[in-house]
Protein backbone atom coordinates (compact mmCIF):
# COMPACT_ATOMS: atom_id res chain seq x y z
CA UNK A 1 0.00 0.00 0.00
CA UNK A 2 1.40 3.40 -1.01
CA UNK A 3 0.06 6.67 0.38
CA UNK A 4 0.77 10.01 -1.29
CA UNK A 5 -1.03 13.05 0.08
CA UNK A 6 -4.75 12.17 0.15
CA UNK A 7 -4.59 9.10 -2.11
CA UNK A 8 -3.72 5.46 -1.57
CA UNK A 9 -2.42 3.11 -4.26
CA UNK A 10 -2.10 -0.66 -4.31
CA UNK A 11 0.46 -0.56 -7.12
CA UNK A 12 3.98 0.80 -6.78
CA UNK A 13 4.24 1.17 -10.56
CA UNK A 14 3.28 4.47 -12.18
CA UNK A 15 3.11 4.70 -15.95
CA UNK A 16 3.25 7.30 -18.70
CA UNK A 17 1.28 7.77 -21.89
CA UNK A 18 3.86 8.83 -24.47
CA UNK A 19 5.38 6.95 -27.43
CA UNK A 20 2.70 4.26 -27.75
CA UNK A 21 1.74 3.26 -31.29
CA UNK A 22 -1.95 3.88 -30.57
CA UNK A 23 -4.24 4.97 -27.73
CA UNK A 24 -5.71 1.46 -27.66
CA UNK A 25 -2.30 -0.11 -27.13
CA UNK A 26 -1.55 2.47 -24.45
CA UNK A 27 -4.66 1.59 -22.46
CA UNK A 28 -4.08 -2.16 -22.84
CA UNK A 29 -0.55 -1.80 -21.50
CA UNK A 30 -1.65 0.39 -18.60
CA UNK A 31 -4.33 -2.11 -17.63
CA UNK A 32 -1.85 -4.99 -17.76
CA UNK A 33 0.66 -3.04 -15.67
CA UNK A 34 -1.79 -2.67 -12.81
CA UNK A 35 -0.80 0.98 -12.55
CA UNK A 36 -3.30 3.25 -10.83
CA UNK A 37 -1.49 6.56 -11.41
CA UNK A 38 -0.79 7.66 -14.98
CA UNK A 39 1.08 10.75 -16.11
CA UNK A 40 -0.32 12.83 -18.93
CA UNK A 41 1.61 15.47 -20.86
CA UNK A 42 -0.68 18.46 -21.21
CA UNK A 43 0.96 19.49 -24.47
CA UNK A 44 -0.18 16.21 -26.09
CA UNK A 45 -3.91 16.36 -25.36
CA UNK A 46 -6.87 18.68 -25.74
CA UNK A 47 -7.64 19.17 -22.06
CA UNK A 48 -10.98 20.81 -22.77
CA UNK A 49 -12.18 17.87 -24.84
CA UNK A 50 -12.88 14.77 -22.75
CA UNK A 51 -13.37 12.88 -26.03
CA UNK A 52 -9.71 13.43 -26.88
CA UNK A 53 -8.19 10.22 -28.32
CA UNK A 54 -5.71 9.93 -25.44
CA UNK A 55 -7.69 11.46 -22.59
CA UNK A 56 -11.01 9.66 -23.18
CA UNK A 57 -9.75 6.07 -22.75
CA UNK A 58 -7.82 7.07 -19.63
CA UNK A 59 -10.92 8.58 -18.07
CA UNK A 60 -12.82 5.42 -18.95
CA UNK A 61 -10.11 3.24 -17.40
CA UNK A 62 -10.63 4.95 -14.06
CA UNK A 63 -6.97 5.61 -13.31
CA UNK A 64 -5.77 8.63 -11.37
CA UNK A 65 -4.40 11.18 -13.82
CA UNK A 66 -1.22 13.05 -13.03
CA UNK A 67 -0.91 15.91 -15.54
CA UNK A 68 2.65 17.04 -16.09
CA UNK A 69 4.21 20.29 -17.23
CA UNK A 70 6.63 18.71 -19.70
CA UNK A 71 7.72 21.36 -22.17
CA UNK A 72 7.84 24.16 -19.61
CA UNK A 73 11.20 25.90 -19.52
CA UNK A 74 10.59 28.25 -16.59
CA UNK A 75 8.72 28.29 -13.31
CA UNK A 76 6.25 30.78 -14.76
CA UNK A 77 5.41 28.51 -17.70
CA UNK A 78 4.97 25.52 -15.40
CA UNK A 79 2.66 27.42 -13.06
CA UNK A 80 0.55 28.61 -15.99
CA UNK A 81 0.26 25.03 -17.30
CA UNK A 82 -0.63 23.75 -13.83
CA UNK A 83 -3.60 26.09 -13.56
CA UNK A 84 -4.81 25.09 -17.03
CA UNK A 85 -4.70 21.43 -16.03
CA UNK A 86 -6.51 22.01 -12.75
CA UNK A 87 -9.27 23.93 -14.49
CA UNK A 88 -9.69 21.39 -17.29
CA UNK A 89 -9.29 18.12 -15.39
CA UNK A 90 -10.50 19.10 -11.96
CA UNK A 91 -7.38 17.83 -10.22
CA UNK A 92 -4.81 19.62 -8.11
CA UNK A 93 -2.32 16.79 -8.55
CA UNK A 94 0.65 17.77 -10.68
CA UNK A 95 3.89 16.29 -11.88
CA UNK A 96 6.14 19.33 -12.07
CA UNK A 97 8.62 19.15 -14.93
CA UNK A 98 10.86 22.01 -16.02
CA UNK A 99 13.65 21.20 -18.45
CA UNK A 100 14.95 24.06 -20.62
CA UNK A 101 17.34 21.93 -22.69
CA UNK A 102 15.43 19.86 -25.26
CA UNK A 103 18.44 17.66 -25.99
CA UNK A 104 19.23 16.34 -22.52
CA UNK A 105 15.91 17.04 -20.76
CA UNK A 106 17.68 17.63 -17.48
CA UNK A 107 15.37 19.19 -14.87
CA UNK A 108 16.20 22.76 -13.86
CA UNK A 109 16.72 22.63 -10.08
CA UNK A 110 16.36 26.36 -9.46
CA UNK A 111 13.17 26.82 -11.45
CA UNK A 112 11.73 23.56 -10.10
CA UNK A 113 12.19 24.58 -6.47
CA UNK A 114 10.80 28.05 -7.19
CA UNK A 115 7.71 26.68 -8.93
CA UNK A 116 7.15 23.94 -6.36
CA UNK A 117 7.05 26.38 -3.47
CA UNK A 118 4.54 28.64 -5.21
CA UNK A 119 2.33 25.79 -6.43
CA UNK A 120 2.11 24.23 -2.97
CA UNK A 121 0.96 27.58 -1.61
CA UNK A 122 -1.67 27.67 -4.37
CA UNK A 123 -3.13 24.37 -3.24
CA UNK A 124 -1.49 21.92 -5.64
CA UNK A 125 -0.29 18.45 -4.72
CA UNK A 126 3.14 18.66 -6.27
CA UNK A 127 5.29 15.73 -7.36
CA UNK A 128 8.44 17.27 -8.86
CA UNK A 129 10.67 15.53 -11.40
CA UNK A 130 14.20 16.42 -10.36
CA UNK A 131 17.82 15.42 -10.50
CA UNK A 132 19.11 12.83 -8.06
CA UNK A 133 20.33 15.57 -5.73
CA UNK A 134 19.82 14.79 -2.02
CA UNK A 135 20.00 18.45 -1.01
CA UNK A 136 17.45 19.54 -3.60
CA UNK A 137 15.10 16.68 -2.72
CA UNK A 138 15.20 17.70 0.93
CA UNK A 139 14.44 21.31 -0.01
CA UNK A 140 11.49 20.17 -2.14
CA UNK A 141 10.22 18.17 0.81
CA UNK A 142 10.58 21.20 3.09
CA UNK A 143 8.48 23.45 0.84
CA UNK A 144 5.64 20.93 0.96
CA UNK A 145 5.93 18.60 -2.03
CA UNK A 146 3.90 15.41 -1.63
CA UNK A 147 6.68 13.23 -3.08
CA UNK A 148 9.92 13.64 -4.98
CA UNK A 149 10.70 12.03 -8.32
CA UNK A 150 14.49 11.90 -8.82
CA UNK A 151 15.83 10.52 -12.08
CA UNK A 152 17.63 7.23 -12.45
CA UNK A 153 19.14 8.29 -15.79
CA UNK A 154 18.19 10.73 -18.59
CA UNK A 155 14.58 10.54 -19.79
CA UNK A 156 14.02 7.80 -22.36
CA UNK A 157 17.62 6.55 -22.17
CA UNK A 158 16.81 3.09 -20.71
CA UNK A 159 20.18 3.23 -18.89
CA UNK A 160 18.84 2.13 -15.52
CA UNK A 161 19.85 3.37 -12.08
CA UNK A 162 22.94 5.35 -13.05
CA UNK A 163 22.38 7.62 -10.04
CA UNK A 164 22.07 4.77 -7.54
CA UNK A 165 24.46 6.19 -4.92
CA UNK A 166 22.55 9.48 -4.77
CA UNK A 167 19.18 7.74 -4.84
CA UNK A 168 20.16 5.73 -1.77
CA UNK A 169 20.88 8.96 0.14
CA UNK A 170 17.62 10.53 -1.02
CA UNK A 171 15.64 7.48 0.09
CA UNK A 172 17.38 7.28 3.45
CA UNK A 173 16.71 10.92 4.39
CA UNK A 174 13.22 11.35 2.91
CA UNK A 175 10.07 11.48 5.02
CA UNK A 176 7.86 11.65 1.91
CA UNK A 177 7.56 9.04 -0.85
CA UNK A 178 10.41 8.72 -3.34
CA UNK A 179 9.43 7.76 -6.89
CA UNK A 180 12.33 6.91 -9.20
CA UNK A 181 11.51 8.49 -12.53
CA UNK A 182 13.29 8.39 -15.90
CA UNK A 183 15.87 6.04 -17.33
CA UNK A 184 14.38 2.75 -16.15
CA UNK A 185 14.81 0.48 -19.15
CA UNK A 186 14.02 -3.10 -18.11
CA UNK A 187 12.00 -4.70 -15.30
CA UNK A 188 15.10 -5.59 -13.29
CA UNK A 189 15.87 -1.87 -12.96
CA UNK A 190 12.45 -1.34 -11.41
CA UNK A 191 12.92 -4.26 -9.03
CA UNK A 192 16.28 -2.86 -7.93
CA UNK A 193 14.73 0.54 -7.20
CA UNK A 194 12.07 -1.02 -4.96
CA UNK A 195 14.63 -3.28 -3.29
CA UNK A 196 16.76 -0.28 -2.33
CA UNK A 197 13.76 1.40 -0.70
CA UNK A 198 12.08 3.53 -3.35
CA UNK A 199 8.34 3.78 -2.81
CA UNK A 200 7.49 3.54 -6.51
CA UNK A 201 8.86 3.87 -10.02
CA UNK A 202 7.50 5.64 -13.06
CA UNK A 203 8.00 3.86 -16.37
CA UNK A 204 7.01 5.01 -19.85
CA UNK A 205 9.52 4.54 -22.66
CA UNK A 206 10.60 1.03 -21.67
CA UNK A 207 7.02 -0.19 -21.95
CA UNK A 208 5.87 1.91 -24.90
CA UNK A 209 8.74 1.08 -27.28
CA UNK A 210 8.94 -2.64 -26.49
CA UNK A 211 8.07 -5.05 -29.30
CA UNK A 212 5.15 -6.16 -27.14
CA UNK A 213 4.20 -3.28 -24.80
CA UNK A 214 1.43 -5.26 -23.09
CA UNK A 215 3.75 -8.13 -22.24
CA UNK A 216 6.43 -5.68 -21.07
CA UNK A 217 3.86 -3.93 -18.87
CA UNK A 218 3.10 -7.25 -17.19
CA UNK A 219 6.82 -7.89 -16.71
CA UNK A 220 7.19 -4.52 -14.99
CA UNK A 221 4.20 -5.23 -12.77
CA UNK A 222 5.71 -8.50 -11.61
CA UNK A 223 9.16 -6.94 -11.14
CA UNK A 224 7.81 -4.12 -9.00
CA UNK A 225 5.83 -6.58 -6.88
CA UNK A 226 8.96 -8.70 -6.44
CA UNK A 227 11.11 -5.70 -5.53
CA UNK A 228 8.62 -4.46 -2.96
CA UNK A 229 8.31 -7.92 -1.38
CA UNK A 230 12.08 -8.30 -1.28
CA UNK A 231 12.42 -5.01 0.56
CA UNK A 232 9.67 -5.86 3.03
CA UNK A 233 11.16 -9.29 3.74
CA UNK A 234 14.37 -7.78 5.15
CA UNK A 235 17.17 -9.09 2.90
CA UNK A 236 20.43 -10.24 4.47
CA UNK A 237 23.41 -7.93 4.62
CA UNK A 238 26.21 -8.05 2.08
CA UNK A 239 29.50 -9.60 3.21
CA UNK A 240 33.04 -9.21 1.97
CA UNK A 241 33.84 -12.87 2.62
CA UNK A 242 32.11 -16.19 2.04
CA UNK A 243 29.97 -17.68 4.80
CA UNK A 244 28.90 -21.31 4.63
CA UNK A 245 25.19 -22.04 4.75
CA UNK A 246 25.81 -25.45 6.35
CA UNK A 247 28.62 -27.00 8.48
CA UNK A 248 31.71 -27.86 6.49
CA UNK A 249 33.29 -30.52 8.74
CA UNK A 250 30.54 -32.26 10.72
CA UNK A 251 30.21 -35.22 8.36
CA UNK A 252 33.97 -35.90 8.59
CA UNK A 253 33.88 -36.70 12.32
CA UNK A 254 32.58 -40.23 11.70
CA UNK A 255 35.29 -40.79 9.11
CA UNK A 256 38.06 -39.79 11.50
From Swiss-Prot:
Reaction(s) the record says it catalyses: [ThiS sulfur-carrier protein]-C-terminal-Gly-aminoethanethioate + 2-iminoacetate + 1-deoxy-D-xylulose 5-phosphate = [ThiS sulfur-carrier protein]-C-terminal Gly-Gly + 2-[(2R,5Z)-2-carboxy-4-methylthiazol-5(2H)-ylidene]ethyl phosphate + 2 H2O + H(+)
GO cellular component, one term: cytoplasm
Active site location: 95
InterPro entries the record matches: Aldolase_TIM (IPR013785), Thiazole_synthase_ThiG (IPR033983), ThiG (IPR008867)
Purpose: Catalyzes the rearrangement of 1-deoxy-D-xylulose 5-phosphate (DXP) to produce the thiazole phosphate moiety of thiamine. Sulfur is provided by the thiocarboxylate moiety of the carrier protein ThiS. In vitro, sulfur can be provided by H(2)S.
UniProt similarity note: Belongs to the ThiG family.
Name of the molecule in the record: Thiazole synthase
Gene expressing this chain: thiG
